[in-house]
């Protein structure tokens, strides 16, 4: 099992029960198509199981993490993250930060000037499977092995 997971909120706020929206707020997934990188701990995986009908997640690899940091990472004021910002945080490059996130050594919410989430666009060419069903039932929700390619289309 990987040390970190990439979680993407697929469904919006309409008809979302209070317990699910509260759980997703705790995971920093307040809006549709937001993505977060979380360490694969039992309590966080339990939260993902609880809201699996609203989010999709996949084990994170370093290349995807670096691509997200380079293209979609933002700091306060919604400004792009520069290499100087990464040096202030103690990382020489985005590859080093991506490796630390993938290994579960740090979280984006602990790196203060950075936003704890990535704002993604809807996927180019749409979803190939249903957004209303779990992955095992020909959908995309829950633990999804193909989510990495979908996220690359959303960047």
From Swiss-Prot:
Annotated InterPro entries: Ribo_uL30_ferredoxin-like_sf, Ribosomal_uL30, Ribosomal_uL30_arc, Ribosomal_uL30_euk_arc, Ribosomal_uL30_ferredoxin-like
Q: Keyword Ribosomal protein: yes or no? A: yes
Q: Return one Gene Ontology term, BP aspect.
A: maturation of LSU-rRNA from tricistronic rRNA transcript (SSU-rRNA, 5.8S rRNA, LSU-rRNA)
Quick one: a GO cellular component term? cytosolic large ribosomal subunit
Keyword Ion transport present in the record's keywords: the answer is no
Origin: domain of life = Archaea
UniProt keywords (A-Z) are:
Ribonucleoprotein, Ribosomal protein
Signal sequence bounds? none
* Stored CDD domains: Ribosomal_L7_archeal_euk (cd01657)
The GO terms this record gives for MF are: RNA binding; structural constituent of ribosome
The subunit field of the Swiss-Prot or TrEMBL record says: Part of the 50S ribosomal subunit.
Q: Which family does it belong to?
A: Belongs to the universal ribosomal protein uL30 family.
Supply the PANTHER family for this chain.
60S RIBOSOMAL PROTEIN L7 (PTHR11524), LARGE RIBOSOMAL SUBUNIT PROTEIN UL30 (PTHR11524:SF16)
What is the protein name for this chain? Large ribosomal subunit protein uL30
The record lists the organism as Nitrosopumilus maritimus (strain SCM1)
Which gene codes for it?
rpl30
């Amino acid at each position: 099992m990987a040390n970190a997971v990439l979680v993407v909120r697929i469904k919006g706020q309409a008809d979302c029960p209070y317990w699910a929206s509260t759980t997703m707020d705790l995971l920093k997934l307040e809006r549709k198509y937001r993505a977060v990188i979380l360490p694969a701990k039992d309590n966080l995986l339990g939260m993902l199981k609880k809201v699996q009908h609203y989010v999709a997640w996949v084990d994170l690899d370093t290349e995807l993490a670096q691509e997200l940091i380079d293209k979609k990472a933002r700091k306060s004021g919604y400004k792009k993250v520069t290499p100087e910002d990464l040096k202030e945080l103690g990382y020489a490059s985005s590859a080093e930060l991506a490796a630390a996130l993938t290994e579960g050594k740090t979280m984006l919410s602990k790196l203060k000037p950075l936003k704890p989430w990535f704002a993604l666009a809807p996927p180019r060419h749409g979803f190939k499977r249903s957004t209303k069903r779990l992955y095992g039932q020909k959908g995309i929700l829950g633990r999804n092995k193909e989510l990495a390619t979908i996220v690359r289309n959303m960047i």
